[in-house]
A protein has these predicted regions:
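Cap/insert and terminal regions of metallo-dependent hydrolase folds
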Residues: 171-261
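Divalent metal-coordination and catalytic microenvironments
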Residues: 3, 31, 40, 63, ...
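Active-site metal-binding motif and surrounding structural segment of the metallo-beta-lactamase
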Residues: 44-91, 186-187
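Conserved beta-strand hairpin/beta-sheet module of binuclear metal-dependent hydrolase folds
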Residues: 1-52, 152-169
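Short internal beta-strands
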Residues: 87-94, 228-230
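Structural motif
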Residues: 37, 58, 139, 162-164, ...
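Metallo-beta-lactamase
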Residues: 93-152, 159-160, 250-264
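Active-site metal-binding loops of divalent metal-dependent hydrolases
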Residues: 8-9, 36, 41-43, 64, ...
Length: 265
């Protein structure tokens, strides 16, 4: 199982120039599972070639915020006419409602559940429920409840060789840690840390982690996966990374970057 990081930033922009060369662009949350499953649909999706976009059959959306869905309308528009079957968008009922009301509403973007025809759409919805897993080609995706400002999910993704957990945007909660600590074959734990410690009040309001709280939450972990961190705000990326090292360095966190790959084999 191959989990490719298409985007994992908390915003846009690029890293500083080095030796006169442009820095790497930051891309928002989007991850490619093997070749056919997309986990979130942020701006990282835009870097995939068209033939790779065409292979994506399933999109799992953690929640309705723009940085996790913004590439979905354009992706569907790009490949819909050249596919033989619709792309299935898996999400909470509340997230599906938000997509219908605010994105695919014929005002912001066409409704691809009606194009080119009701009987032959480019997109179909599949509602998710927490702890109700879906198996696709030997990979099982189990939705995990998240604690965010809108209804949200994380995902436990597993195959015969092992598994990973992607928290999505969340303040981890008791149910989250019960799930994580019950996974014997957990290879990777992907958590977000969006803000610096000086912005802790904003982090709490926005329901994102800051480094001190990340360290506090990690003390609840009873398994030993590789810890991966995402969603750092580009404007404070270096400061957030330093604070993560200072407060959670004993857990050997890895700050993920666009282009990284997590293999489970």
């Amino acid at each position: 199982m191959r989990f490719q990081i298409l985007g994992c930033s908390g915003g846009l922009g690029g890293s500083p120039r080095t030796a006169g060369q442009p820095g790497k662009p930051f891309r928002t949350s989007s991850f490619l599972l093997d070749q056919d499953i997309l986990i979130d649909a942020g701006t990282g999706v835009e870097d995939l070639p068209v033939d790779e976009l065409r292979r994506i059959d399933h999109v799992f959306i953690s929640h309705s915020h723009l940085d996790h869905i913004c590439a979905l309308p354009l992706m569907l528009d790009t490949v819909g006419s050249s596919r033989e079957r619709p792309v299935t968008v898996h999400a909470l009922p509340e997230t599906i409602h938000a997509l219908k009301e605010h994105i695919f509403n014929w005002v912001i973007w066409p409704d691809f559940t009606e194009i080119p025809h009701f009987d032959h759409p480019w997109m179909v919805y599949s509602p998710l429920q927490v702890d109700n897993p879906i198996t696709i080609g030997g990979r099982t995706i189990r939705p995990i409840g998240a604690n965010h400002t809108v209804p949200a999910l994380g995902f436990h993704i597993s195959c015969e060789q092992g598994s990973l957990v992607y928290s999505g945007d969340t303040l981890p909660n008791d149910a989250f840690w019960r799930t994580v600590n019950g996974i014997a074959d957990l290879r990777y734990l992907i958590l977000e840390t969006a803000f610096t410690n000086r912005e802790r009040d904003l982090a709490v309001t926005a329901k994102h982690l800051h480094p001190i709280q990340l360290a506090e939450e990690l003390n609840r972990m009873r398994v030993d996966p590789q810890l991966c961190i995402t969603h750092l705000k580009p404007s404070d990326r270096e400061q957030i990374a330093r604070e993560i090292e200072a407060w959670a360095g004993r857990f050997q966190p890895r700050i993920l970057q666009t282009g990284d790959v997590l293999d489970i084999d």
